[in-house]
Every structure is written in structure tokens, then in C-alpha cells.
Swiss-Prot record:
Protein name per its UniProtKB record: Uracil-DNA glycosylase 1
Xref: SUPFAM superfamilies: Uracil-DNA glycosylase-like
Gene3D superfamilies, per database record: Uracil-DNA glycosylase-like domain
Catalytic residues (positions): D65 (proton acceptor)
Coiled-coil intervals: none
Single GO BP term: base-excision repair, AP site formation via deaminated base removal
This enzyme's EC code(s): 3.2.2.27
Organism: Bacteroides fragilis (strain YCH46)
PANTHER family: URACIL-DNA GLYCOSYLASE (PTHR11264:SF0)
Protein role: Excises uracil residues from the DNA which can arise as a result of misincorporation of dUMP residues by DNA polymerase or due to deamination of cytosine.
């Protein structure tokens, strides 16, 4: 199957695109776009891939579902466009960066500047029905994004994987810990951040690891 995606990802994921499950997934999602309000707009489904080529990835942040409210999600996990109110989880991420590194808390929740530096914030599920959280779980996206994690683990070295919350932590089994750093904590959601996300210091730990490998750190 021909999928419009950045060339370095195309090369490594074509095997997935050609599998029967992916064809079923695409057909399901296309049908959904035809009958319901689906997020993000179709051209933004692979936005994080198109913005961060395979060889540029330094830090992987794994989420679960896209934001279900129209105008928020545009294909980058946790991120929202300029001018959109910063969601609670992202606000807590910014607070932890402030506590960890002393960075001022941004006025915008747009994380494009992270992505340009090699941060790869990817949801496990890449589409959702508006106002219906989790409505596109178990249709095939998880199989695809698991393959993305495996491909990064196998073909790259010295990556940092940030796994927040029990769902993301389950993905640790896909990652080669001899080659990569895995950082785990509770989810930054307002419901859980006080129980181990605040104080996790993942952002300084990531930069320390990158520097130790001779890799330029992230300006969080």
C-alpha cells in the first residue's frame, strides 16, 4: 500500500504498510472520515513522522490517544496549536521542566520546536472520533505503532524513551535496554502527576544521557 509519509519512514515501514492488518485499518479509518468527525484531519495523521525523519529521532515520548476535542490534536502527542489552551497533562509537563531545568513555562502548548530537535512524541493510536476518547483503539493502530517502536529500537542506538503511565510502560518490552535509556513515571495527568511525575527529572536525565553519548541535548 502506498502511504504518504516522509521518505526515511516510508523506507522502514513499507513492510507494515503492505500487511493485511494495515489495509483493514486504512479502510476502517477512511470509512470513519466519511461518516463522522475524525481527528486529526487526514493530512495530519502522520505529522510527527513527516516533521522528524527516522535518523533525527533522539527522544521518544509515547502517549495513548489523541486529544478528542476539535482544534487540539494535529498529529503530535501532547501538543496543541498556538493559541489553544494548554491541556492539564501538558501543563504538568511544563511545570516539571521548570522544576527540573529552571526553564520558564511557555505560553504556547505547541511542541513543534521539540520535534525539530529530535523529540518524537507519538500516540499509540493515531486517530479518534471527536469527543469520544479511545474510540479508535483496537482497530490496528497499536500494531502499527508497536512496529515503529521496535524499528527505532532495532535500527537506532542511544535513544531515550519516556514512558509515562501504565499503558506506556507496557511498551518497555519492545525496547532493547542494552542500546537505549528507558525512563518511566506515572502519567502527567492532573489525576496522577503528584504521585511520581513531579520530581521525576526525566528531562535533565535525558540530556545527561545524550551528552554522555556525544549527542546534542534537547533545549526543552
Amino acid at each position: 500500500m502506498n502511504v504518504k509519509i516522509e521518505s526515511s519512514w516510508q523506507q522502514r515501514l513499507q513492510e507494515e504498510f503492505d500487511k493485511p492488518y494495515f489495509e483493514k485499518l486504512v479502510n476502517f479509518v477512511k470509512n470513519e472520515y466519511g461518516k463522522a468527525h475524525i481527528l486529526p484531519p487526514g493530512h495530519q495523521i502522520f505529522h510527527v513522522f513527516n516533521s522528524c525523519p527516522f535518523q533525527n529521532v533522539k527522544v521518544v515520548i509515547l502517549g495513548q490517544d489523541p486529544y478528542p476535542n476539535p482544534g487540539q490534536y494535529y498529529g503530535i502527542c501532547f501538543s496543541v496549536p498556538d493559541g489553544v489552551a494548554i491541556p492539564g497533562s501538558l501543563s504538568n509537563i511544563f511545570k516539571e521542566i521548570h522544576q527540573d531545568l529552571g526553564k520558564p513555562i511557555p505560553n504556547s502548548g505547541n511542541l513543534d520546536r521539540w520535534v525539530k530537535q529530535g523529540v518524537f512524541p507519538m500516540n499509540s493510536v493515531l486517530t479518534v472520533r471527536a469527543h469520544e476518547t479511545g474510540s479508535h483503539r483496537n482497530i490496528g493502530w497499536e500494531t502499527f505503532t508497536d512496529a515503529v517502536i521496535k524499528k527505532l529500537s532495532e535500527e537506532r542506538e542511544n535513544l531515550v524513551f519516556m514512558l509515562w503511565g501504565s499503558y506506556a510502560k507496557e511498551k518497555a518490552s519492545l525496547i532493547d535496554t542494552d542500546k537505549h535509556l528507558i525512563l518511566t513515571a506515572v502519567h502527567p495527568s492532573p489525576r496522577s502527576a503528584d504521585y511520581g511525575f513531579f520530581g521525576c527529572k526525566h528531562f535533565s536525565k535525558a540530556n545527561t544521557f545524550l551528552r554522555s553519548r556525544g549527542i546534542e541535548e534537547i533545549d526543552w
